[in-house]
Amino acid sequence: MKKYLAITSKGLENLLADELIALGVTDPKVVHAGVKFEAPIEVVYRCCLWSRIASRFIQILSEFDVRDDMDLYLGASSINWPSYFSADKTLVVDFNGTNREIRNSQYGALKVKDAIVDRFTKADLPRPNISKVEPDLRVHMRLSGEKGILGFDLVGSGLHQRGYRTEAGRAPLRETLAAALVMRSTWDESKPLLDPMCGSGTLLIEAALMACEMAPGVKREKWCFEALNDFDAELWAEIRSEARVKSRRGVKKVDARFYGFDRDYRVIQTARENARRAGVEDLITFDVGDATKVERPEGFENGVILCNPPYGERLSTEPALIALYSEFGRQLKEVFGGCTASIYSSNDDLLACLRMRADKQFKLNNGALPCVQKNYSITESAERKEAVSVEVAPEFMNRLKKNIGKIGKWARKEKLDCYRIYDADLPDYNAAIDVYKDYIIIQEYAAPKTISEDKARRRLTDMIRATVLVTGVETNNVILKVRQKQSGKNQYQKLAEKSRYFDVEEYGVKLIVNLQDYLDTGLFLDHKLTRKMLGEMAAGKDFLNLFAYTGSATVHAACGGAKSTMTIDMSRTYLEWAQKNMNTNGQTGTQHQFLQADCLQWLQQADGEFDLIFIDPPTFSNSKRMEQTFDVQRDHIMLLENLKRMLRENGTIVFSNNKRNFKMDDAALEKAGLKAKNISKQTLPLDFARNKHIHNCWIITHKED
């Protein structure tokens, strides 16, 4: 009997060996990412047609040592290629692996191709043609260290290509992997199966194909073994016909029901089309639904929930996933008692958010990504009901409810879309939580080194889940940021390219925010009363805004009736943002000027006069584009002296900064001919009442003679 190699994903070797035994293979040998076996051609044909988890079947022609390219060429030349296929067949060489001497797979493929062609030409036969587009034959060369395996790929394109899927949702599973997940779950044909995040429906379709005993390769039209000289067309036709009959009968006798849900209607439509092409559309019910709210279908006794939820590369950047897994775990325990769940993910931290203990787990890669499949029993006991009723982080939840009751009422009265509902009120939950219309931003302060990473992560997941429960916010609308002490050079750090801008309202003014592209959102919430005050002071006045950021103070001044405005910032991005803010509020006249400049340098040489000046400089800055460093404690008098030249006789400077323990140098200020009034308390809004030092704010005017 000839030798063969069945290739599969790492972690599925033993499962594949069991499958091959069921298909008639005797004594299979498990190897890395595959199974070796010997079998008659009838069994091989059945394996190609019926294997659900093999990606390819290789007929092994030779195994030999490969130390260098000469060994490779001689090993390939030793095979009598014309005895296997005729020269009129097209072929391609697939070369997998490298070693110390053969470092390029394309070079390795070229040497094998040369050896094949040379065997034909030396036998006075025509050269076979090489074609990378739908070749008749694929020659497979696998190199691992100094060991090589050379043979024919009997399949052609991978066996995961069943023919029913032409498009998929985001990050689709390969059909072979999906079939393995079904096999490793607790599902069998006697149980209903539900996928609450079904995407394009691959898991459910693969399970349905198993239930109706439909061969996964039955719709496949081309097989590379058909181009070999020893191809037995009559035997193959008999095996395929037998499979088709079995499939037709199987569809009619299936009792199992399958249910798929996804939030995306377009993906559900794709899943329905895939099921139709697979011939199992009558077995699967697809519908739009949220996994965190999915209800138990009627008759779903002892059912199985199987899914592949989304998983981010880093927990800290995927708060929506923390909320999703937490809420999904709660829903499973609350609604699906007596059932089992099988969840596949690359992220153990996210699986921990389910708050469920796995009965079994299997390591199984998704491509190159290490993943794990965990099976859970969902108990229906009193213990389960008690666990469901326990609040997550009750102390934190109670504080959040109290804050929302008080601050939410105030925000609605003041017509504010954006406000803070929690600001590290409790030492164990060290974060700030802000509402931005329909979104929640959780800004986690970096945990001290004395707190273990596991404990900090658990507190974070508790906070996120509790916030979702208390606020009712959609899980996709939760955004997490980690706040650390910012140096001047990264005070407005760019985080990602997501470009999600939308309008919010603040005291009748519309302002544009972006919650994800930058560490800050475009709106400093602690200054909402300061901006309101500037709007009330600005009527008929010439207004100057320095270190303007996104110009929100300018918008308030303009909407308050300012005669003119000048907005200055060093960042072109933020100046353009400021212009959009003004345009959104209909403030588009030429009396509103915007200037990109180093504010410190501009102040030293600028002229012009203003009635109202707002300046909110950084605490410290050493930006490469600034000619000098700036320290607000050290340099505030110099700053105010420069502003004095531009301040009209009855004018006002509103000076603010965020330095804790800032001290105004009253003596130096008086010497400069200015006087100051501290209005920090008056500009502290209710949502920042606990944080007395969030900012300092002063009214600066000319000293009376």
Curated annotation (Swiss-Prot):
Keywords, comma-separated and alphabetical: Cytoplasm, Methyltransferase, RNA-binding, rRNA processing, S-adenosyl-L-methionine, Transferase
EC numbers: 2.1.1.173, 2.1.1.264
Pfam families: Methyltrans_SAM, RlmL_1st, THUMP, UPF0020
Subcellular location, principal: cytoplasm
Catalytic activity: guanosine(2445) in 23S rRNA + S-adenosyl-L-methionine = N(2)-methylguanosine(2445) in 23S rRNA + S-adenosyl-L-homocysteine + H(+); guanosine(2069) in 23S rRNA + S-adenosyl-L-methionine = N(2)-methylguanosine(2069) in 23S rRNA + S-adenosyl-L-homocysteine + H(+)
EC top class named in words: transferase
GO molecular function: 23S rRNA (guanine(2445)-N(2))-methyltransferase activity; RNA binding; rRNA (guanine-N7-)-methyltransferase activity
Domain THUMP span(s) in chain numbering: 43-154
Localization, UniProt: Cytoplasm
The keyword Metal-binding belongs to this UniProt entry's keyword annotation: no
Family: Belongs to the methyltransferase superfamily. RlmKL family.
Physiological role: Specifically methylates the guanine in position 2445 (m2G2445) and the guanine in position 2069 (m7G2069) of 23S rRNA.
Protein name per its UniProtKB record: Ribosomal RNA large subunit methyltransferase K/L
Species per Swiss-Prot/TrEMBL record: Aliivibrio fischeri (strain MJ11)
Designated gene of the protein: rlmL
